[in-house]
Amino acid sequence: MSPGTFALTWYGHACFGLHAGAHSLLIDPYRPGGFGGAMALPPIGDPFDAVVVTHEHDDHAALDALVHPAPRVEAGPTGPFTLTRTRVYHDEYRGRRRGGTTDILSIAFANRRLVHLGDVGHSPRPDDLKALNAGPRIDLLIVPVGGYFTIGAAQAWEWCRALSPRAVVPTHAADPRVGLKLRPISHFLATSPWPVEEVEMSVECDEALLSFKSRVIVMGTSAH
């Protein structure tokens, strides 16, 4: 893998694996069979150097369900990755309806920057944008789009326009393997001003993918 190239794997729901060179980081692991069987997703069998979570809900922070346990990291440097957090709310009522706060994760490495919006439930606020736009341009933005528990399509596009990433990966949307009340990714794609590229569960993010006009990358197309 050449410098500046990284691989992203989607495991389901809001869980992603990041590989940069020989180093790896898992984001927001779910619990297989969680929520009374609603999370009908397979165990995460790949090993990782470390795990980071956006918030403590069981569909995002089930470290004890990993096949290969890995240490949890919070912020600062871990291997080649530097993690920073921006605290936001799970809904538009300061977290009173959907369970408090969630963090936005910014992960910088090898002249790249990935941002995972967690379960953000409101439009971007000036302080959010000030914090997130303080660093280099975002290469890849992972944004929830399914609504109900998080923002939906319209507010997701507010975040995308405000942060202007090179590429967007929509997540936390309807999935036949997840029995939660979520809207399909198609609602988000219907108003996309950017070209859409469909891939399967993994994608190699290189200069060719990230250098041109902003685009939407839909991962795991067979699952939607």
Where are these regions (language model features)?
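Active-site metal-binding loops of divalent metal-dependent hydrolases
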Residues: 29-31, 56, 88-89, 118-122, ...
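Pre-active-site segment of Zn-dependent metallo-hydrolases
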Residues: 15-52, 60-72, 87-100, 120-134
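Metallo-beta-lactamase
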Residues: 3, 62-103, 107-111, 193-213
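Conserved acidic residues
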Residues: 49, 139, 166
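Residues that mark the start of a beta-strand
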Residues: 7, 23-24, 111-113
